[in-house]
Each structure stands twice: as structure tokens, then as C-alpha cells.
Amino acid sequence: MGKKVHNAKARQNPQTIVDNSAVKKIQIDVDAVAGGNQVGYDEANALVLPSEKRATKIKVDKVQHVKILSKKQRKHLQAIVDKKKKKEGRAQLLGDLAAVQIPEEELQQYTSISQVQTVGLKRLPTLDEYLAKKKERQAQVLAEKSSASGLRVNAIKGSKRKLLVEEEEELQAKRKNPNVISVEEDDEDSSSSDEDDEEAPAQSAPIAIPTPVSIAPPQIAVKPPIKKLKPEPNPPACIHQTVYVPVHRTTEVQNARLRLPILAEEQQVMETINENPIVIVAGETGSGKTTQLPQFLYEAGYAQHKMIGVTEPRRVAAIAMSKRVAHEMNLPESEVSYLIRFEGNVTPATRIKFMTDGVLLKEIETDFLLSKYSVIILDEAHERSVYTDILVGLLSRIVPLRHKRGQPLKLIIMSATLRVSDFTENTRLFKIPPPLLKVEARQFPVTIHFQKRTPDDYVAEAYRKTLKIHNKLPEGGILIFVTGQQEVNQLVRKLRRTFPYHHAPTKDVAKNGKVSEEEKEETIDDAASTVEDPKELEFDMKRVIRNIRKSKKKFLAQMALPKINLDDYKLPGDDTEADMHEQPDEDDEQEGLEEDNDDELGLEDESGMGSGQRQPLWVLPLYSLLSSEKQNRIFLPVPDGCRLCVVSTNVAETSLTIPHIKYVVDCGRQKTRLYDKLTGVSAFVVTYTSKASADQRAGRAGRISAGHCYRLYSSAVYNDCFEDFSQPDIQKKPVEDLMLQMRCMGIDRVVHFPFPSPPDQVQLQAAERRLIVLGALEVAKTENTDLPPAVTRLGHVISRFPVAPRFGKMLALSHQQNLLPYTVCLVAALSVQEVLIETGVQRDEDVAPGANRFHRKRQSWAASGNYQLLGDPMVLLRAVGAAEYAGSQGRLPEFCAANGLRQKAMSEVRKLRVQLTNEINLNVSDVELGVDPELKPPTDAQARFLRQILLAGMGDRVARKVPLADIADKEERRRLKYAYNCADMEEPAFLHVSSVLRQKAPEWVIYQEAYELQNGDSTKMFIRGITAIEPEWLLLYVPLLCNIREVREDPAPRFDKTSGKIFCHVDATFGKSGWELPLGEVEMPLSEKACCYFGMFLLDGEVCSRLADFRSKLKSTPASVIKSWSSMNNKVLRFKRALITKQIHNRQALIDQWNSDPHFLLEEYQNLLYDVALSELTPLWPPVDKKEPQRQ
């Protein structure tokens, strides 16, 4: 019991329960208790008390002592709890499994695993042989017994037969094992064996033996065939019928195809394409995906009824791939064709069509569902061009629409270094992630070599590295990556001078001292790619002849052979020994190639070998602006004894595969054109490439054998400064042309379009503002501000031209004053970049214009008057016209060389001119425009109109000269001599040094392009494509950017009867900077004052001629409507309010109101007249003359 606690009873704190049953029986009259506070009575303060003592009961709470469990009991209870939890989990699991179990009807259609052969396959022949022997022995025994059927069989003899039966039963049990099923067993065999078992007892009936008790072997229950349920009719699915279209290739082509990695994946690729509407194929360059995948689809029958479309981001790739595929398939070009911006060979018989992505986008505008195609292949998707991103977004919606209509369209996205996450993880683009196929490239291992330090002068470093490779490493082509055309030409010129190539005719020269004409032409052709100046070309020719004569003298001097001791020389080793000596391992080679010094830049100590002993280099340039003929030279065979060396921009990164390349020198940079999202200012900046691009460049060295890639930057720079992928073009460039095309296609909410990488919101807003300024979009004049701007009629016209929207507006406004031929030439020239060859230093403003040898001739093309004020576009106009005439005479190359024009650019200008001419003739019925080679220059008046048309298209690119009079500092005035303030820029911009208006420096100009250049540690802004304008034109052609401060009443506003509008003189400013504009006349903007002035002209009879007869009966003059005291006259006030309420400020608005309400203004006008009844005016109302136009 334990020790009793002191005062334990008091410590218990029991609960006393009082029996209140007697109190509850007492009846209380509540109303009789006057003023009683019933709420205040409780158990402690009762209202009444019973007469007798209440019974109480003490309740003591019993304290329950918790019994402590032992460890064994706790484990036992825990096991019970765990068992219960497992049972609960098992029930939940069984319930979940039952929920996803297939129906019983469907389950019966499957084959049980017990009916599938799984084990015992090797023992089947042995068992069959053993069973046959047993059956033979049994047959012999039965035959003997049948012959002596009258004899009684003793137990011993019967026991032998019993043993045989038992052995056979045991063997049959093994054969009937549900895990072992003979592949030859069928229903007939099983039924026959059952019959034999039934006949056996009948035959042994006379034999007096006890019937053996045997266990029947387990038999497989063969279920009768179940009729499959007919599936319910589903919507038309994409069921591809197996088709094979034979292709007769040559043996050589077939053998070459078999070496491509994608040929091994053909089965998997085609099965994936057949089963999925959208497929992504990722494979390194050289895997053969571009050339082989269209052939797979052709052989699978996708080109039987529709075409296979393949898009390429570059025109060169589209043409080259088309010809290559046609050659491999042994098909004519009429069936495997291409279509690019200016040319194509597509015919009605075309089955495979290669095109640029812009061409396919234009086809979607006319045929949204692409009903001509069965497959669309988007190649080079990793380059992420603007058109490719739009096509991916559009096709992601077109493919499901075609599937619903029962005309499935396959979409295949191909790329070398694909940003797979942009496609597979973008649920807004693809609701169901498309399958990804990775094709391994036919790639040899490439050893990557980094620099210890990253040099600043990467061109000089590339030159030194090339010398090391050429002098010390084995045979193999060299591919050098630099940033731009200037660096390509500089490096090509330097390498050609260091390792010159002497043609075969040099032997004849050594004999007779003469140079053949063929050698001269070939030498000139080699020098033309790098030396643009004819004087330099002539100097190079003379230098070549001089070197040949020197080599002749050296040859004669060496004819007297000296005595040579062969013991002083060591026999040369083979290539393998040279490889081992020069390339013991990666570290040694890196160290040997990196220990360069600046002395190697000198041409005397470059190689340490005589000019006659050095192996020549066949150095070729490659960049996008190079002519197609010179680009194709990289595919031609290299002359004997030469090593191929290609100096290229990033064109050779993915678009073209250059043969015989073993060494790659990667500078790690690229020239990127950056755009300001708000102002549109562009800047060419040399930046690091992405890691994906660097890997692409390195992969070029592993096409023919194991190669090496020498990266002219450190590994730390590669890890820290290189992005994984380049930023898509759609996020870097202005997108107004993209927005206008999409809006004309019916895509109003461009923000919600499923871009793989959507453009920035700032880009879209800036593009929308520019299109509104151009008049292509119009803000809705409703209270609902959420509606996007609507496309105007002008916007639809602009979208039909394959040029930028600003140039499209210029074409749309040129249908007057015979300006269309000149505008077409201007637009074609302005749309092609770098038409003019610029020489000399262009960044220094102190360089005189005469430093450019073409400047004087261009100054004569824009000599004076409006020709000069038209400025640089006038130079382009004269150049295009003269080049067209020279081309008709067959003298285009000579003309371009003599006048500083790029021949390739002039060819593109002519193609675009022809295309624009055809578009205009197609869309405008009353125009017969042609490309006239004898087009005369425009007149002075036409040149003035062309200035206005240029302003209409480039109204957001207006610049005003910096006022030098306000600058006191002479140095600052000298620095800002050619400086202009642009509308959206804070820093001043300078006129381009080659502009013909640089000396004149007009006060107001428009420019075609603003760009930024690095000038030392700072940057400097330049503008080019300059045209002078008059400031009063801004109010007329760019009204949305003008700010009207005040409407002038002197001179008084006037009403133009032709247009039905009011014109007035205003004080205005231009742009955000508030540049003052001279006094100009414009249409009076909508305001209460404009409505009052319109009412004055209406009462005066100028708006409607029928009301002129009532002018004498007016109670007050028409001018009283615009007076301030007119509000005191109720009748005049009602007339004014009626016009202001309906916003009637021109004749067309009044006519529209009368069309909806014919009695508008009838009562108000009648109140302003003397002695004119309402019945007299009603027949005349509305007072619109039938000859007056209903729509302006």
C-alpha cells in the first residue's frame, strides 16, 4: 500500500454533486418577480431554495496507474500493430490494382503465360526421341499379347506392362508441364492422345490384372477461340500503310550512303515518324540527316500524293542540298527542286522541295494548312532564326488541324546542337512532348587544345598557329575561324604571301621568261578575293612576275652542283615517326604550339625554310558576301603538292561541310549584330561564341580522320565566359515585319503566340509603336482599350511586299507622278546590305571625303538641287540604273569594279527588283511596270517627291543637326561639326564619312540606319543612308509624332470642299525632344473648336450647297458659332452641342451620322432661321447633294 500521505483526504479535492431535483420542481411566476434580474441568478445565487436539505454525493476520481510494459510485451504489441497496418495497406493496394485492372473481356483476348514456351527448349529433341522408343516398345508388347490372347497373363508379365505405362505417364507429365510446351503440338495431337488413352483399357480387357491406379497427367485446358469484341469506331487515326518506292542509285552513291551513321538508324527513325506526328531529330553535322531523311521519306511513300518540304535557313544550303539529294537519288531536278527568294526550279512534278524558311512562311499566308505537303522538315533548327521560330509555332497548331481533317501532316525538326528543352519542355508549344531521336555522327576523335592565356590579337595568334601546323604537323586541311570579312581577307593575304603557290606554267616561264595568259588570269582571280584596288592588283601581278624571274636566276645559279657529303645528313623518317616526334601527347604538343613569340609575325623568319622548299598553301576565303563561284572553290580538288587552308567566318560552322579538314584553328569569337530594343540602333560587336558553336567548330576536324582543334583561348574563359547556347535571333532583332505578317494572318494576340523562345515584351511594344507610326496599324477608337490595334488597309498592302514594312509603305505611296520605277529601284537597293564598296578609314571624322577614290564619282551622281538633297539614296538609284544598263551590254563586272560596287549585291538588287515588279503588276491592275535597262534618271521634281516618300517610310528616323551656335568651346564645336540629334537617342550621332551630304550637312535629315562602333575605350554613333528633308513636311507625313500646341486663328482655318475637311495653321513640335517646327497647315485635329468651326462652315453653306439659300435667313451670323459669347444663346448652344456630342468635324462624319439618323440637326437648324417652318425643311433633309461623295 505504501506510506499514507499527510492529510490525504483533503488532498484528494473531491467533486461534490448536489441533487437539485427538488428545486426544479418549484414553479416560479417570472412575471410576478417585478424588476428581477433573471440573468443574474445562478447556482451560487439561487432565486428560490427548497424547504428540505438537498442530498449531496461526493465523487472521488480514481487515479489509474499506467502499468509499464516489459520489453517483450512491447515488441509483441508492436508486431500486432505492424501486422494490422500491413493488412490495411494490402487492402488499399488491392483496391488500387482493381481500379486499374483491364476488363475481363479484354483479358480473355490475351494469351496466358502458361501457353508460352519458356523452358526446356534444348531437351525437346531428346524427349521426343525417348517417347518414340517407348511407344515402339509398347506396340511390340501389345502385338505379342494379341497373338496369345487366349493365354492367361501372370502377374509378373503384367507388372512389366504396368511399369511401361507408368513410365509413359511420367514422361507425358513432363511433356505436359505448363512451363514446357512443344512447338509442334496442336489440338489434333492432344485429341488423338486422349483417344489412345481411352482405347488402352478396352484392348487389355482379357488380361487378368488389377487396373493400375494412376494419376492423370496435368493437361492444358485449351480454351475455345473467343470472338474478339468489335472496337467502337474511333475518329480517323493516322494509320500509315507500308509502301516502298524503289530508288535506283548508282553503286558509288550507295556505297557512300552506307558509311553514314543515320543509315543504321533508318528503321527506328521511320517507325518513330510513322507513329508520331511531330519528331525531333538531333544529330551532329556529318551524320547525314539533311540528305538522307528526305530519301527515307520518299522511299516510304510520303511523296506519292503530296510533296516533302525541307526548309533551310540559308539559300546556299538549300541549293546545295537540292542538287546533292537529286544526285544521290538519281532523279532529275524537276522532281528534287529548290525555291529561294529570287530563284528556283520547282515544277508541277516536284516531289522533294528544298526552300528557305521565309518561302514556307509566305506559303502559309496563302495556304494555312499547307495542303500540298505531307511532311515538313525544319533543318538547322539550332540556329533559331526568326522565321524558323515562327514556323515551329505555326506548325505546332497546323499539325493537329490536319490530323482532325484526316489529312495528317508530319513535322520533323532537325538540328545539330538542339536546345531540346525549348521544345520538349515547352508545354505551350507542344502539349505532348515530341519524341527525341539522337543520331550519332560519323565522327573521329578530335583532340582539343586550349591556350594558356587568351590573346587579345587573335588574328595574329591564328596566323602563328597556322604556321606551326603547316610546318610541323602531317598532311591535312586547315580550317581557320575568324569573325568577319575584313579579317578573312587580311589573313588570306598574309598566308598567301607567306606560302605562295606557283602554278604549273612556271616551268615554261623559267625557260622563256614569259608568263602565259592563263597564269595571269588565274593569279588575278586569286588576288581578286583579297585585293579590291586595281592598282594593288597590278602591283601584285608585277610582284609575281618579279618573283618568277628571281626564281629563274636562283635556278641557274644552282645549276653548278656543289659537292655534298651524304654522311653529314640523316635519313628522314616516315609519317608515323614524325607524328610520334611532333605529337608525343596532348600536353607536349600544346606546349610546343603555345611557345610562340611575336618574331614569327615577320615574314623573314616564319618557317626557317627557303621559299623553294616550303610546301605551298592553297588558301581560300569563305564568307557570306562572297560570290557563289568563289564559295564553291572550297569543294574543288586541291592542286598537287598543296595543303588546303580555308579562312572562314561562322558560315562554315554548320551550313557547309568542307572536305579534307584535319586541323581547326578557332579564335572563339564571332561578330554579333546587337539591336537596341527601343531605338533599333544596331552595333556589330565581337563577342565570344557559345559552347555549342565551339563544339560545332571543333567537330569539323573529325570528318575524315582523327583531328585537332586549337582554341585560341583558355579553358577558364571557355567555362566562365561562354554561354551554353546562342541567344535566338527573335530575341535580338526588331520584329515589326514579323508582327505585321502575323497580324495579317489573323493572329491578333502576338504575345500569346507559342514561340519556342518568345520575344521580349519591350520588343513587341516597340514594334507595335513603329507600325502605328507607319499607318499599318490603327488604335481602336472605342472605349475598350484591351483590343489590339487593327490592321489598316495600308497594312495589308504593305504585307504583300517581301521587304521591311517601311519600304512596303514607300512602294504603296508611289502610285503617282510616275514614281513607281524609281521607288522599286530605291527599295531594292536599300534592302540589300553593302551595295557600295567603302575603302579608307570610316571612323575618323577628320578624314576628307576625297580619301575615298569612289567619292568624287558618287558626288557627281548627286550633284545639285533635289538630286543632292536626295543624298545617298540618289547614289544608289543612279548605281542601280547604270548597272542595269551595263548588265544589258554584258559589262557588269567591269562596271562594278570601276565604280566600287559589289557585283553579288547588284545581282541581288536586280533579282529583288524583278520580284517587286512582278508583285506590283500582279496586285495593281492598271500598272504595267517593267525592268527597263534604259531608265532615265528622275527629274528634279520627281527627286523632291522621292524625298517625301522616303520621309513617309522613315518618319521615326529623323535627325536634327546639333546647333553649334550654342556651344562656346571650340574643341567641342569641332568635335560636333557633323553631329546630329536623333529622336530617340540621348547621345549625338555623326554622319557617315562616305555620305554625299557630309559637306552640306543639312539642318533636318532622315537616315536609313544608325549603328555604333567602338572608338578606343568609348563608343561612337553613326548614321548612314542620309536624305535631307524640310521640317514642314513632318506635320503632313508623320503626324503621329508631332505635338500640336496651339491652333492658329490667324491665318483663319479654311474648309476644303474636295476632301470635306478643315485645315488650319498650327504651332507644333516634333518628337519627345520637342523640336520646334515652323508654322504649317494641317487638318484641324478633333476638338470642340474643330466641331464649332465645322458648324460655322455648315451654316455658311460651304459643306452642303443646298443650305446656302438659307444663309440670309439666319438669326445670327455663322461666325457666331465660334465666338465665346455664343453659349449665352440657347439656340446656338443646342446646335453646337449636337455637333460636339457626335464628334462631327468633317463632312464624312456628318454624312455617316445622317445615314444612321436622317433627322439629325433638323430641329436645331430650323431654330436658327427666321420664318422657315419645319415642314419646309423636312423635304430637303438631309441636305446632301447627290453629286457629293458619300465616302472619301
Swiss-Prot record:
Q: Where is this motif: DEAH box?
A: 379-382
Q: Which UniProt keywords apply?
A: ATP-binding, Helicase, Hydrolase, Nucleotide-binding, Phosphoprotein, RNA-binding
Q: What is the lineage of its organism?
A: Eukaryota, Metazoa, Ecdysozoa, Arthropoda, Hexapoda
Tell me which family the UniProt entry assigns to this protein.
Answer: Belongs to the DEAD box helicase family. DEAH subfamily.
Chaperone in keyword set: no
What Pfam families does UniProt report for this protein, alphabetically? DEAD, DHX37_C, HA2_C, Helicase_C, OB_NTP_bind
In the Enzyme Commission scheme, what number(s) does this protein have?
3.6.4.13
- What is noted besides the main data? 'Kurz' means 'short' in German.
* Keyword set includes Transmembrane helix: no
Q: What region holds the Helicase ATP-binding domain? A: 270-436
Catalytic activity annotation: ATP + H2O = ADP + phosphate + H(+)
Q: Name one GO molecular function term.
A: ATP hydrolysis activity
List the protein's name.
Probable ATP-dependent RNA helicase kurz
Q: Where is this region: Disordered?
A: 170-214, 504-529, 567-612
Query: Bias regions of kind Acidic residues — which residues?
Result: 183-200, 584-607
Q: Which residues form the Helicase C-terminal domain?
A: 540-746
Modified sites of kind Phosphoserine = 529
Report the top EC class in one word. hydrolase
